[in-house]
């Protein structure tokens, strides 16, 4: 049986990235909550060269 988590940086960024969050009202609320909480990372960050 195939596992449910098949890591891919592309799909990770496309679904949970900062720009995607900012694109909708609810996404902006997520960012706002994380800022208020003092999170170091507001959204997923994929290491790039």
Curated annotation (Swiss-Prot):
Gene3D superfamilies: 1.10.287.3980. One of its GO terms (molecular function) is structural constituent of ribosome. It holds the Pfam family Ribosomal_L34. One of its GO terms (biological process) is translation. One of its GO terms (cellular component) is ribosome. Keywords: Ribonucleoprotein, Ribosomal protein. Belongs to the bacterial ribosomal protein bL34 family. This is Large ribosomal subunit protein bL34.
């Amino acid at each position: 049986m195939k596992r449910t988590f098949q890591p891919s940086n592309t799909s990770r960024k496309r679904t949970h990235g900062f720009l995607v969050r900012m694109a909708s009202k609810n996404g902006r609320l997520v960012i706002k909550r994380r800022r208020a909480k003092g999170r170091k990372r507001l959204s997923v960050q994929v290491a790039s060269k």
